[in-house]
Each structure stands twice: as structure tokens, then as C-alpha cells.
Amino acid sequence: VLDNSPYDGKLILDNTSYNKESWVEWGNLEKAEAIPGSLEFLKYASEKGIEIFYISNRYSEQLEATVNNLKKLGFPNAEKSNVLLREDDRSKSDRRKSVSDYYNVIMLIGDNLADFNDEFEVKLAEERTNYTDQMSDSFGTKLIVLPNPNYGDWESNGLFGGKSYSNQEKDSIRKSNINSY
């Protein structure tokens, strides 16, 4: 629900790639904005009596900053007990189970299929496709996939308009569209 695209913009501008140190630094700034529609949707759910949990692969050392960022934006249930961050394992399975052991989980929202089920973790494309087909009835009801603004088909079909560009031209187009901190 937090838009981390300024972090990716910073990586591009600095001509570097993801690393834990810079990721923690970004999270500790508490400057992420809400993904459009996420705040309104979760407030609506909360008003209807739904308990909200935030399961993220931000690192556990970012808990206080993440909770503060969520609170500043007005997200419901933005408490340490409801924000489940990564320890060592990037899999969200144990964190999802810690919620489902005490709550009836009615919906999962994420920008990565592995946010919903470990069957999607590091699988071949064909396996992921088959599993997606098996779960198709859950998409849009129990499983809500958020668009990921940082990478995916949107780049070739959206940003580049389906046209072919050299790597240098692509870099120039990307940089002209960056939102950074």
C-alpha cells in the first residue's frame, strides 16, 4: 500500500541497484505515499469491521518507521502488532499463517503472486501459469493484484509505446519519467 517508486527512481538516478542499506535508508525516511486508492479502500474495509494486517518484505528493523509512515498517511490498524515485516526469510507464508491462525482471512492484496501463495515462489513460468489458472476464480475477489509501477509489461507497452528503442534511448525515456526523493 506504500508507493516505493521514489526509491527505484533514486537507484536509476544514482546508476545503482537495490541493496539492503539503501532500502532501509529509504524506508526510514517515512516518505512513501499511498498507492492510489489503497488508503480509501482500507479505510472502507476498516469501517465495516475488517481488521487490516500489513505483510511486507521491508526488514524488521524498519518496523517503527513503516508504522509511522502508515500512520502519517492515515492507514487503519497501523500498529506494530498489525505490521508483519521480514526477518530472514523473504517468504510471507509464516506471516500469513500467523494471521490466519486467529482470523478468517477474506482477502489478500499484493503486487507479486508470491504475496498470495508460496506456490509462486521461484517457479518456472509454466508452473506459475498453471497455478495461476488453478486459482483464477480467486483473482478479483479473494486475491487482488496491484499493478507494480516499477517493472513489468507496462514498460514495453506503456512507457515505450510498443516501439523499439536503443538502451540509451530507453534510459533517456525512463529518466524523463522518474519520481525520486
Annotate each language-model stretch with its function.
Residues 59, 63-181:
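C-terminal cap/substrate-recognition subdomain and adjoining C-terminal extension
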Residues 1-89, 181:
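Alpha-helical substrate-recognition element adjacent to the catalytic core
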